[in-house]
């Protein structure tokens, strides 16, 4: 018989006491939500795989961004495309470029329905399969329509990955390095982007080079899927299933203990059961023992979490990030880079800067905290956006202003919104609504990205680049107030403590 949430109580120190005769869950009496909990023990070697294989999915996302910019140039070449339908219209190019984005939106919608049923691990296995199928279809595509099917399929893998990867990492990483691990996922995305630009530049002068660009990554989804098959399910997801009666409680608890031992290494062999009992008690205390309804997303602590997560990923996009990167080559050209100075090389330069600044964020995030990095980074973005606006309105004969503003923007974004947006959405939602909540946040992210990308050109023609960048600067100022008054500090807290203290 499964664990019965009705047949439990909270003891005087806040512990779950189940009826063992019903095959339920019992927990030892331990202090709950301690003010100063001791750091979680873990083995460094054991902590690497639960990060590495989900992060491969993020790397594949970044690679797609970099490689596609090169693939478009290859596809449009009469001599190098190797196809008869190379004469692509601007609409065709837009469909190819945004095909993965539409797929990601579909993947986010699918994740909303199935994430809490199949779990984070199986979702990442499915994402790896979609990556592989999408890449293969793209590589062999004989006609335009098949190419788009491949792009959309690959994009569905992106949507599932960007939903499940931060969740799996957040739920399996020790609290003292959780921020660093999830920020490293963003580092993987940027690394993939730089790799995509680099590999794309190698194949761009080869006939049918665009096929080789996508073929290069075929081993990675296989590695990702194999690795996720080997890794255990998230112990918190297993305990959520137990608390909500979605299986035999005792068996699920034992599976969670085994999972935790594998994720943290032999150093916690003697304390794994105790840690699982503490997590169970904390989950029960904050109301995770009742199955969530859709309406709960928009009430109480869940609404607050949705406001924080949705606001961060919305500001992540509407503060101009897609537009600034889109406009980067022309900005650098005004500073003396020739038009033939290869957009690829320019993109690699920016990608390396993004990589360095994301690395800085990874190093300091669990020491400094989320809020200080957000406030400092976004303040730098405000300055850079107003500088860009001023350049286009008043200082067009001083290209150094544009270059400095561009580099400042990219660096500050990667120090703040870039990694911390994904980190916060992975840790702020209550466990029982984490799957659905993150899927909505991912949907907002990709939707806002699409909106800003598509609206940029007409708005630039209507308002002018100077006014548009200043408008982004004003939105950035609004985001500073949002961060200061709404976004909590989660540094060093367990996921259960975040739910109890920050929501």
UniProtKB/Swiss-Prot annotation:
Region (Disordered), start-end ranges: 1-23
Swiss-Prot/TrEMBL GO biological process terms: D-glucose transmembrane transport; fructose transmembrane transport; positive regulation of flower development; response to nematode; seed germination
Cross-referenced InterPro entries: MFS_dom, MFS_sugar_transport-like, MFS_Sugar_Transporter, MFS_trans_sf, Sugar/inositol_transpt, Sugar_transporter_CS
Record's compositionally biased regions (Low complexity): 8-23
One cellular-component annotation, GO: vacuolar membrane
Cellular compartment(s): Membrane
Keywords (A to Z) from UniProt: Membrane, Sugar transport, Transmembrane, Transmembrane helix, Transport
Primary location recorded for the protein, binned into one broad class: membrane
CDD domains linked to this entry: MFS_GLUT10_12_Class3_like
Transmembrane segment boundaries: 51-73, 95-115, 129-149, 152-172, 190-210, 213-233, 305-325, 346-366, 374-394, 405-425, 437-457, 467-487
Domain of life: Eukaryota
Membrane topology: Multi-pass membrane protein
Pfam families hit by this protein: Sugar_tr
MF annotations from Gene Ontology: fructose transmembrane transporter activity
UniProt record similarity statement: Belongs to the major facilitator superfamily. Sugar transporter (TC 2.A.1.1) family.
NCBIfam families to which the protein is assigned, alphabetical: SP
Official protein name in the record: D-xylose-proton symporter-like 1
Origin organism lineage: Eukaryota, Viridiplantae, Streptophyta, Embryophyta, Tracheophyta
């Amino acid at each position: 018989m499964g664990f019965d949430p009705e047949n439990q109580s909270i003891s005087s120190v806040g512990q779950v006491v189940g009826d063992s005769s019903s095959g339920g869950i019992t927990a030892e009496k331990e202090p709950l939500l301690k003010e100063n909990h001791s750091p979680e023990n873990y083995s460094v070697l054991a902590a690497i795989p639960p990060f590495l294989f989900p992060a491969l999915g993020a790397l594949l996302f970044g690679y797609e961004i970099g490689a596609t910019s090169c693939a478009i140039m290859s596809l449009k070449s009469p001599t190098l495309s190797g196809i008869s339908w190379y004469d692509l219209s601007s609409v065709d190019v837009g469909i190819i470029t945004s095909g993965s984005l539409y797929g990601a939106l579909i993947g986010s919608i699918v994740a909303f329905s199935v994430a809490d049923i199949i779990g984070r691990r199986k979702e990442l296995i499915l994402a790896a399969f979609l990556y592989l199928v999408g890449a293969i279809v793209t590589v062999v595509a004989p006609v335009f329509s098949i190419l788009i099917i491949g792009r959309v399929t690959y994009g569905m893998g992106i949507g599932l990955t960007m939903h499940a990867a931060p969740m799996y990492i957040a739920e399996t990483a020790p609290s003292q390095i959780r921020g660093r691990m999830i920020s490293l996922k963003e580092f993987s995305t940027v690394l993939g982007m730089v790799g995509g630009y680099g590999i794309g530049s190698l194949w761009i002068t080869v006939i049918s080079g665009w096929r080789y660009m996508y073929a290069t990554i075929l081993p990675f989804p296989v590695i990702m899927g194999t690795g996720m098959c080997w890794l255990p399910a998230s112990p918190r997801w297993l305990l959520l299933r137990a608390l909500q009666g979605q299986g035999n409680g005792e068996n699920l608890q034992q599976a969670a203990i085994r999972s935790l031992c594998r994720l943290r290494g032999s150093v916690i062999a003697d304390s794994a059961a105790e840690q699982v009992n503490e997590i169970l008690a904390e989950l029960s205390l904050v109301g995770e023992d009742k199955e969530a309804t859709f309406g709960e997303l928009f009430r109480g602590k869940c609404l607050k979490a949705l406001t924080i997560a949705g606001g961060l990923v919305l500001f992540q996009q509407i503060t101009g990030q897609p537009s600034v990167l889109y406009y980067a080559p022309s900005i650098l050209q005004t500073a003396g880079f020739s038009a033939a100075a290869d957009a690829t090389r320019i993109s690699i330069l920016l990608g390396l800067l993004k990589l360095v600044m994301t690395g800085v964020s990874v190093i300091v995030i669990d020491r400094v905290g989320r809020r200080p990095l957000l406030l400092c980074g976004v303040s730098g973005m405000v300055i850079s956006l107003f500088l860009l606006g001023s350049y286009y309105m008043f200082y067009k004969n001083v290209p150094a202003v544009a270059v400095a503003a561009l580099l400042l923007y990219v660096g500050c974004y990667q120090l703040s919104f870039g990694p911390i947006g994904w980190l916060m959405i992975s840790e702020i939602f209550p466990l029982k609504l984490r799957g659905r909540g993150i899927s909505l946040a991912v949907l907002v992210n990709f939707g806002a990205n699409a909106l800003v990308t598509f609206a940029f050109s007409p708005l630039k023609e209507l308002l002018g680049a100077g006014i548009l960048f200043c408008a982004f600067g004003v939105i950035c100022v609004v985001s500073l107030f949002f961060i200061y008054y709404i976004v909590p500090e989660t540094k060093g807290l367990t996921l259960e403590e975040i739910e109890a203290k920050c929501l």
